[in-house]
Amino acid sequence: SLYDELIYALIADSEQALLFCEKYSPLFDFDYVYEPAEDILGLIYISCKNIDSRKATGSYYTPTKIVKKLIEKLDIASDARILDPCCGTGNFLLQLPAHVRFDQIYGNDTDTISVKITRLNMVLKYDILSVKTLYEHITEADYLASDSKTSYQYIIGNPPWGYEFSESEKEKLRKNYRTASGKNIESYDLFIEKALRNLSINGQLSFILPEAILNVKAHTPVRTAIMESNSIRYLNFLGNAFDKVQCPCIILQLIHTGKPLSTVGMEVSDCSHCTTILTNRKISAEYFSFHTTDAEYQLLEKKLRKKADYFSD
């Protein structure tokens, strides 16, 4: 069966697997209940991975409550193409709404075991009968190295943070990505740049990212790329949302308009309040700041104009 094939694909050494079963036989005395849309396999896998390996690849397991928060802000059409370019074990794809069919979904990752777990998760959630279709939609591939021009209506996920590229990789990336121009190359900047190329007009990108992308100078090139032909639809300040990771993060949802950035209709949220920007603000790629309400922003603008008039006199 398809289940058997996918499970055996996960087991690299059958003898070692049998020894494990014998050694830890009490584990098999428990009654396990399948919870739909819960990525238990992925959680176990990422928990068992060496911490140094996780840091080197920038891989951290995204809490399901954050994934759900991201997905809930997307109004996904019934015929839309959806991509998670760094799908890990498939947690984001598992949380997609019930009306989404598997033939709309695409995911890839460079981690072999993660891809195998994603395939198994997809078979558990969706009525998939074709191995060929499964392997075509969930692939082991390097998104950043791909020259695919395929367009998607939604690109979602949690791209790697702080991936350690080799010197040869950096050389190749600098030829293909404007956000790779600095001394230190940040992986999530590259994923944003690449994803924006693959979005259809009015398509949406929604990533979980470090808050630093909004204001740290090194990320000016990616902010410039965002401003050129996209607008920010939703920004949620999550704080330190990852266990034992001291790094404030955000949900950043962009819409690819094909026009310069406009702040009109942008929703900004944090743990205490939510506001919608109704005016088109002056935004610089040097620093993205959206903490003020429209009234506060207009007051600040008024004070700045007065100061400018004073010095011009």
Regions found by a protein language model. Give the residues of each.
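Class I S-adenosyl-L-methionine
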Residues: 1-124, 142, 215-222
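Signature of N6-adenine DNA methyltransferases within the class I
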Residues: 62-66, 87, 93-94, 102, ...
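Short, conserved active-site loop motifs that form the nucleotide-linked donor/cofactor pocket
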Residues: 136
